[in-house]
């Protein structure tokens, strides 16, 4: 089998560069910002992203989880609306709907979501 490094180079699995790139660097502190840190969390402390990741270790990975993780790594923020975390995929979908349907269409989609969410309770 072969691996593709971050710089695009294709190398064998037993290449020493593969082992060094797959191990996280020691002492690295994850980047924290206002968007991905919960209210009341210290600036260097674990935010909801790390807590959610720890809670989902046993959960099956979906394509949306993978896409969210890649978008967060690229710098798209996760923000909070009340006590709900809004993932980057959801933010991009909302922007796309806003462009395609306008404000009225976006409000209609929000109303349909709200009614369906409240009817499940």
Swiss-Prot record:
Bilayer topology term: Single-pass membrane protein
Feature: compositional bias, Polar residues: 19-35
Location of the protein in the cell: Membrane
Phosphoserine PTM sites in chain numbering: 33, 62
Cysteine disulfide partners in this protein: none
Region described as Disordered: 12-58
Keyword terms, alphabetized: Membrane, Phosphoprotein, Transmembrane, Transmembrane helix
Gene Ontology CC annotation, any one: intracellular membrane-bounded organelle
Transmembrane segments: 92-112
Main localization of the protein described in the UniProt heading: membrane
Bias kind Low complexity: ranges: 48-58
UniProt xrefs under Pfam families: DUF4605 (PF15378)
InterPro entries: DUF4605 (IPR027953), FAM241_domain (IPR052502)
Source species, domain of life: Eukaryota
Family, similarity comment: Belongs to the FAM241 family.
Entry function: May play a role in lysosome homeostasis.
Name used for this protein in its record: Protein FAM241B
Annotated organism of origin: Homo sapiens
């Amino acid at each position: 089998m072969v691996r593709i490094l971050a710089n695009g180079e294709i190398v064998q699995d037993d290449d020493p560069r593969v082992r060094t790139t797959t191990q996280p660097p020691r002492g690295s502190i994850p980047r924290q910002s206002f968007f991905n840190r919960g209210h009341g969390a210290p600036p260097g402390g674990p935010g909801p992203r790390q807590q959610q990741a720890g809670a989902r270790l046993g959960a099956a990975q979906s394509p949306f989880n993978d896409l969210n993780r890649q978008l967060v790594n690229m710098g798209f923020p996760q923000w909070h609306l009340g006590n709900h975390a809004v993932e980057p995929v959801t933010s991009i979908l909302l922007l796309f709907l806003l462009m395609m349907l306008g404000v009225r269409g976006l409000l209609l989609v929000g109303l349909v979501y709200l009614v369906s969410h409240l009817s499940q309770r």
